[in-house]
Amino acid sequence: MLLPVPLLLGLLGLAAAEPVVYFKEQFLDGDGWTERWIESKHKSDFGKFVLSSGKFYGDQEKDKGLQTSQDARFYALSARFEPFSNKGQPLVVQFTVKHEQNIDCGGGYVKLFPAGLDQKDMHGDSEYNIMFGPDICGPGTKKVHVIFNYKGKNVLINKDIRCKDDEFTHLYTLIVRPDNTYEVKIDNSQVESGSLEDDWDFLPPKKIKDPDASKPEDWDERAKIDDPTDSKPEDWDKPEHIPDPDAKKPEDWDEEMDGEWEPPVIQNPEYKGEWKPRQIDNPDYKGTWIHPEIDNPEYSPDANIYAYDSFAVLGLDLWQVKSGTIFDNFLITNDEAYAEEFGNETWGVTKTAEKQMKDKQDEEQRLKEEEEEKKRKEEEEAEEDEEDKDDKEDEDEDEEDKDEEEEEAAAGQAKDEL
């Protein structure tokens, strides 16, 4: 049956609008992840990932993810998917990160690699397409990295995007669009957006300062000048310090022994400081000279900054001082709405229960510490009471001994008298 052209085009449009999921990983099949994720053998001491939902969670099964398990280690683990290009379509990269160890220094980001990556040799210098996610190291570094590899060079964003630094699970989303715009979301809320060309130094600047232009010699940028008619008053110059007129030489001052007496100095009440002529508006003031700009002959627009020929591997290539971070709910798609919905159905469903469990644990820990502190104080008081009791018994014994000695002495004296 032949369909009318408008209906056919509409159906084709609906088909084209279906989201394409290139990669999705939720770790819902137990140890099955070990068949999909490859450990790099580039170094023999890479840290190990384990499957865990952590010490607290919203749903013990749904919140299971890859957790770093060894302190002060590099980690290198990756998963491959069917290669694709994002040319002509949006790219959405999304995952959750949970720093339940209250991380002090370590990465929580992912890298997207082209198809040519040797997963068993993946390491920190392996060339990637995009690096995205949180990075924390001390109080000075708490940022979201958004790094693109452009013509073989890793280019960092010019903006500072602050990441979450608490112990709970957070959803990170990067959207790269075919119009060379981007958006970064945390917990499904936009935290940054803009133009790739404006916020990264992919290209030379459109404008440069005219090399042939220079500030005219008579260009006066001084807004104020000294008043040429102003002059210093004749009585202006006074010393800053003067001898104290109330000081007197001590009566016992011996000039042969102590030298010539000089009175101490004090601040001169008539001292006025350095004289400066008053300021007036400069009649020759022309404002700040602005260097004229010209079109940069080195600049050439690139409509395909956003595009990569091949995405095929998602990798966790990072360093952590204190382990315990959990990665979960990985998603790579071409559909922004689908990614937002997926985030709400995963992180969004369990986040409240996760916090409730953590709050309950914290309250139980607080009560336990209070009880331990109470018990410790009671034991200390009991020990003090026991010591006081022993001291009292010793005093009583000493008193009894003293009384006995006095009685014996009295008896002896009476005997002598007899």
Swiss-Prot record:
Sequence repeats lie at residues 191-202, 210-221, 227-238, 244-255, 259-269, 273-283, 287-297. This is Calreticulin. SUPFAM superfamilies: Concanavalin A-like lectins/glucanases (SSF49899), P-domain of calnexin/calreticulin (SSF63887). The lineage of its organism: Eukaryota, Metazoa, Chordata, Craniata, Vertebrata. The gene is CALR. Monomer. Component of an EIF2 complex at least composed of CELF1/CUGBP1, CALR, CALR3, EIF2S1, EIF2S2, HSP90B1 and HSPA5. Interacts with PDIA3/ERp57 and SPACA9. Interacts with TRIM21. Interacts with NR3C1. Interacts with PPIB. Interacts (via P-domain) with PDIA5. Interacts with CLCC1. GO terms for cellular component: cell surface; cortical granule; cytolytic granule; cytosol; endoplasmic reticulum membrane; extracellular region; sarcoplasmic reticulum; sarcoplasmic reticulum lumen. The modification N6-acetyllysine is found at residues 48, 159, 209. Belongs to the calreticulin family.
